[in-house]
Structure formats: C-alpha cells, structure tokens
Amino acid sequence: MEEITLVTDFFDIGRGQDKNKDLRRTAQRYFDEFKRWARIQNTLVVYTDSDSAEIIKGIRAEYGLGEKTIIIQIDNLFELVPGLLPKLEKISHNKDFLNFRYLPEASSNNPKYDYLWMMKYYFMNDAYERGLLSENVVWMDFGFDHGGITYSDAEDYNFLWKYDLRIRYTFPVCMILIQ
C-alpha cells in the first residue's frame, strides 16, 4: 500500500459576501473547516495566494505536518487561463443561463466560483508536471465536510491515508490488474 498525495486549493473569491446567507462561507470559515482535515498525515499540495499561504502552513504545522505541506503561491489566479473569466461572466448574464438555474444565487452561478472549480484540473496537472505527486492522488476540497457535517470527530482525520488504488477486474477465467 502506498501513501496518497492530497491536492487542494484555497482562494478567497468573496463567498463571504454571497447574497444567499445560507451559502456564505468566509475565508475564516474555510480555514476553520480545513483545520479539521488538515491533520491527515499525507503529503499535501496546496494552491493558494500569498495572503493565505502562511495561515495554511501554520495550521499544518500545528499537527507537525509542516514538512509534508507544499504550498504553490499564485497571486494572479484569474490570469492563469486568460480570457476565461470574462467568458464565464458573459454566460452568467445570459437569459437562458439564468432561466436554467434552480437556485439563482447558488455558488455555481458565480463566474469566479466556476473558474476556480475548473482550476482543480489545472492544479492537478500542474502538480503532476512539477513532480509533486505520488502514484496515488486525491483531490480534497479545502472546505471538505463543512466543519463536521459527516465526520463529527476531528480526530477521525488523524491518520496516514494509504490505499492500494490499483483497479482489479475479475473474470471467470482470469484476473486483470490495471496499474
């Protein structure tokens, strides 16, 4: 069994000011939620801005995991894929887009949120190209578990996550191992 590398990101895109108060999540709330799962003992690659980098490093250091934390600082998030944010903003004002929305004020209707969501794939690829990943990789949303909705005991995260992620298919005559 091999250790899994975790990859995440955090950028304050203004969710603390969302119109729908039930969907608001301030930067501090995200950091509080991260404190719960930050104790997972795996190597963690975090994409964030310089303002948040020290906070994130400090949280991981509280659990003795500073050496297993790799911070990639990006202060120009919306310039990584030039022209994408303006396109998302244009779409967000399109009447067909607006009529399609079940919750008009949902986070997924925010062009910055959509841009950041798309960047998960960009960051995973970037971490791969930088040689930061083990063979087994998991994306963890920074606000995972929303502060204890599913796992009420934060100590549930105090472990080294290892898993044999090789996929096995069993057929009546043979077994195929995909690596």
Language-model region placement:
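N-proximal low-complexity "stem/linker" segments adjacent to membrane-targeting elements
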Residues: M1-R29
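Short beta-strand-to-loop element that shapes/binds the nucleotide-sugar donor at the catalytic cleft/hinge
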Residues: Y169-Q179
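Short, acidic, metal-binding catalytic loop of nucleotide-sugar glycosyltransferases
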Residues: A27-T43, E62
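Active-site-proximal specificity loops/subdomain of glycosyltransferases
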Residues: Y63-L132
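Short, charged/polar "capping" segments at the starts of alpha-helices
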Residues: S50-K57, Q179
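Short internal beta-strands
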Residues: V45-D49
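GT-A fold catalytic core of metal-dependent nucleotide-sugar glycosyltransferases
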Residues: Y115-T170
